[in-house]
């Protein structure tokens, strides 16, 4: 739907009112598959067992004492691609401000984690580019480094978002190094030797280092250029989906041992020498190869304290994150990419947010934040033609899509600094129906419980807190419902 400024002011007033109410009593908000609930206030849960009447019932438990404390929330959000920036910049200043308030402020979704593309991705208009293409000719001094119009627009958009959301964490990920740094010499269109020319593949790291140093300095220059435009880059991954290569658009293989050595010997030291506090997150790919980030941590743990995961494994299994946590308890984890196609199930965004949170993820980012009405702009070759943004821009206005509301059921009520709590009782049957839940202790002392109901009927849910309280209320059919409970 289109959101007017008047409606936004009304929502802002509601936000302030409900914030005051939460201090003394419980509240509940819901978004559902039918679209008649969109972060809508519904009947609040009551203390005790309540009265389920003839409804189905479900029992959940939450350990809201110190023994139940798990990971700390960093934030939720999406990918800021060239498609996002291009589409957003077609809006008038007032409409864009209205939209960004809906995305970045507590009155809206309160997004606080944005992953942006360093150069082109599949969601860029033609032609594909990096920040130092140099006409395809080698530029070992990086004298041709330039953000260009699209990189500059990206940095300015992120800076504007940061001005609205002081807690915003910005993660940058490249889809490829400049073509001249690669063994095949091209940015896209060729999967043969689609690897960085860094010496590790051609000489096992004992001979020529190729362009490893230049690749490291490329990150330094990019981070400094963004900082100069007001966008502090909090973290990078050194390659998006490093085990994937495709002809037609920018991709690049970076193997696990190669990633580890690039970080340990080049990128980590380069960032440190430049006085940059930007973190390096390992991997940025699917859950089916956990040995990859483990190798990086084992060999480059001096510079890597976080791991990024995607959702595209044939059988995505978020418990991999719990297993990884058990081996690496001091390492933060994030779900940094999962797409939201228009044809996807209503609960797709809820699923790829809920599962990682239940398994030690500190943040979740969807693919992508915004697109135009044609799910673009995207590259004509290799571009994603079915990647719908959380927001669709059309004819000078915008539509907040289902995935936006499903993610906001988490992000709006689990702010940065919230502590995820241990819980039990979540279950989904083979037919797809079930109840999934995650809870948090928030910085202001309130507690949040997010309940995803994929059944075709309402369910009366009772949550038993280890602190001694019991809360009960309705979770409407095919919905995500968020309870905000007062301090224990």
Swiss-Prot record:
Keywords attached to this entry: Glycoprotein, Glycosidase, Hydrolase, Secreted, Signal
Active site (catalytic residues): 241, 337
Example of a GO cellular component annotation carried by this entry: extracellular region
Glycosylation sites recorded in the entry for this protein: 422
Gene3D superfamilies per the UniProt record, alphabetical: Glycosidases, Golgi alpha-mannosidase II
Extent of the signal sequence: 1-17
Function noted in UniProt: Endoglucanase that has highest activity on the linear beta-1,6-glucan pustulan and lower activity against laminarin (beta-1,3-glucans with beta-1,6-branches). Is active on C.albicans cell walls allowing the release of a previously described cell wall proteins.
Protein name: Endo-1,6-beta-D-glucanase neg1
Species per Swiss-Prot/TrEMBL record: Aspergillus fumigatus (strain ATCC MYA-4609 / CBS 101355 / FGSC A1100 / Af293) (Neosartorya fumigata)
């Amino acid at each position: 739907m289109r959101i007017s400024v008047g409606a936004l002011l009304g929502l802002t007033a509601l936000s302030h009112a409900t914030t005051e109410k939460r201090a003394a009593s419980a509240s509940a908000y819901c978004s559902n598959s039918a679209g008649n609930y969109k972060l809508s206030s519904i009947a609040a849960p009551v203390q005790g067992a309540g009265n389920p009447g003839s409804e189905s019932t479900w029992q959940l438990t939450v350990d809201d004492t110190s023994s139940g404390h798990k990971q700390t929330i960093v934030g939720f959000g999406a990918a800021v691609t060239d498609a996002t920036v291009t589409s957003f910049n077609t809006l008038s200043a007032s409409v864009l401000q209205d939209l960004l308030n809906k995305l970045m402020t507590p009155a809206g979704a309160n997004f606080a984690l944005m992953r942006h593309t360093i150069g082109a991705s599949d969601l860029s208009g033609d032609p594909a580019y990096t920040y130092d293409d140099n006409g395809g000719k080698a530029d070992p001094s990086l004298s041709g480094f330039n953000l260009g119009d699209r990189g500059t627009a990206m940095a300015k958009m992120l800076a504007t978002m940061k001005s609205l959301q002081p807690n915003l964490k910005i993660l940058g990920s490249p889809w490829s190094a400049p073509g001249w740094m690669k063994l095949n010499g091209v940015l896209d269109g060729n999967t043969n030797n689609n690897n960085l020319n860094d010496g590790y593949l051609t000489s096992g790291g004992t001979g020529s280092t190729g362009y490893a140093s230049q690749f490291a300095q490329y990150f330094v220059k990019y981070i400094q250029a963004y900082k100069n435009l007001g966008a502090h880059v909090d973290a990078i991954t050194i390659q998006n989906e490093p085990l994937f290569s495709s002809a037609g658009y920018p991709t690049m293989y970076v193997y696990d041992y190669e990633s580890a050595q690039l970080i340990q010997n080049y990128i980590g030291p380069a960032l440190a020498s430049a006085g940059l506090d930007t973190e390096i997150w390992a991997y940025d790919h699917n859950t089916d190869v956990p040995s990859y980030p483990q190798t990086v941590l084992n060999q480059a743990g001096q510079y890597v304290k976080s791991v990024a995961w995607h959702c595209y494994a044939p059988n995505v299994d978020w418990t991999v994150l719990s297993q990884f946590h058990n081996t690496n308890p001091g390492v933060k984890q994030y779900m940094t990419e999962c797409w939201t196609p228009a044809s996807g199930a209503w609960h797709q965004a809820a699923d790829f947010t809920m599962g990682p949170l239940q398994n030690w993820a500190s943040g979740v980012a969807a693919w992508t934040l915004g697109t135009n009405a044609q799910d673009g702009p995207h590259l004509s070759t290799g571009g994603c033609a079915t990647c719908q943004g959380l927001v669709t821009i059309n004819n000078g206005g915008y539509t907040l899509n289902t995935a936006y509301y499903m993610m906001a059921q988490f992000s709006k009520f689990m702010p940065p600094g919230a502590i995820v709590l241990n819980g039990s009782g979540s279950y989904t049957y083979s037919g797809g129906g079930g109840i999934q839940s995650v809870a948090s202790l928030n910085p202001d002392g309130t507690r949040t419980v997010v309940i995803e109901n994929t059944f075709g009927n309402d369910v009366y849910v009772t949550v038993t807190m280890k602190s001694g309280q019991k809360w009960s209320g309705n979770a409407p059919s095919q919905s995500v419902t968020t309870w905000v409970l007062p301090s224990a």
